[in-house]
């Protein structure tokens, strides 16, 4: 079983790490090429490219200038501990027991505009580059062109034909994977909440739930779709009634 999640724009490079382990990203050479192009952009160009404030443009301009091809424990941090958004609140990675790290490293993959795809312990440097950004290299017009073939082939090389591919990434990041060419069966869970008497997807809760489900799969060592349907973190429950497609199981609360 493989799980994919989105990265986060919010980063944490301050908290004490629970492990000294760190691995090298698969596509570091491509990431370095992207950074070289980004480092040539002005602050105004970065602001326009990413639709961010001048303050954030200043921060990321500095990040791209300081980016180093050599990723080590002094200038980088394992991805699972560096990302700090809603998904990672649900995943709660700092509390994952160290004896579960091998399982985590084998099972979870993080899609990334800068690095393509990351294992949890892959070292990354601070960056901001959303997958939907209109910037490309290698004669590609955007990041989907840069990454889709690379990421899909990478994931296929890791998977068996009978494996489940649990898609917990956002639509923006899911498009970086050509799911039609993936081995195995793609499962895309949906999380809905009752609000004002109506069942709907609420973005903040859905993001956190994706992280919680990834944590559940690691904690419970899930191997089958039935195992996944047992997801009950944060009071969610699988709903047969609201599930119209078995590959898109709906969880409600």
From Swiss-Prot:
Q: Please state which protein family the record places this protein in.
A: Belongs to the UPF0246 family.
InterPro entries (alphabetical): YaaA
HAMAP family, A to Z: UPF0246 (MF_00652)
Lineage, opening ranks: Bacteria, Pseudomonadati, Bacteroidota, Flavobacteriia, Flavobacteriales
Q: Where are the transmembrane segments?
A: none
Report the Pfam families cross-referenced here. Answer: H2O2_YaaD (PF03883)
Task: Name any Gene Ontology BP term.
Answer: response to hydroperoxide
Tell me what this protein is called. UPF0246 protein GFO_2679
The source's domain of life comes to Bacteria
Entry's Gene Ontology cellular component terms: cytosol
Q: Which NCBIfam families match?
A: PRK02101.1-3
